[in-house]
Amino acid sequence: KQRLANLEEANAVLEARAQERYEAEKAAYEAKQREREEKTRKPRGRKPKPPEAGPRDKDQYNFTDPDSRIMKNSNNSGFDQHYNVQVAVDQESLLIVAPSLSNHPNDKKEAEPTLDALSPKVGKPKAAALDNGYFSEANIAALEKRCIDPYIATGREPHHKIWRTYFKQLPDQPPEEASPKVKMAYKLQTEIGKAIYRLRKCTVEPVIGIIKEVLGFRQFSLRSLLAASGEWCLVCLAFNLKRMHTLYQAKGLL
């Protein structure tokens, strides 16, 4: 009976996840359609296919830790059972000011929860730089609503730029009716946009690297979303204590 009850629970969870995925894919599909319609030239490539509702053959349920999800591993060599961790990092001190954790594979949903995790005691950031995995109109609106100037990449940057890109002139400012994606792409090409976004690479990425390589944290010991969230907060606290020791030492206070 218990096995049957577990299977029924798993089926209900898969149905709920499928509906959540369908709604997210539908919103993304509608956004792509709007973007195609806004273009003055005839769009290239095939029209995006509308999403299909319901569970898929490859959908899985983990009985050991039902809260975790199948996600791409860090080196993109396959898929594992994971949680999605996030940190907001202060650019000047390199201290973690907001940790968050979820079971959403897509980072687009993670900007707002991380912003919500920011305590008023640490102050309000003037600007925020995020990579292209976070780009969405909703995230731009969420940052602007909090009076935070957003700088979100609209696409992947090539690792090795050709020399012509360094001498490329700034294009004309897009019209007011241009899409948020076009406006953001222009914003990131301005001098201030390039300067702020450049700082992201030496702010968040070193923190994640230190957590993995120096603190040695690469997997969770606890199960469930709540327990894993607590464990992630402890890891971020450990990083901050280590970082504060370095900062105090540099000022001759230790």
Specify the residue positions occupied by each region the protein language model found.
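Anion-binding and metal-coordination hotspots
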Residues: 1-254
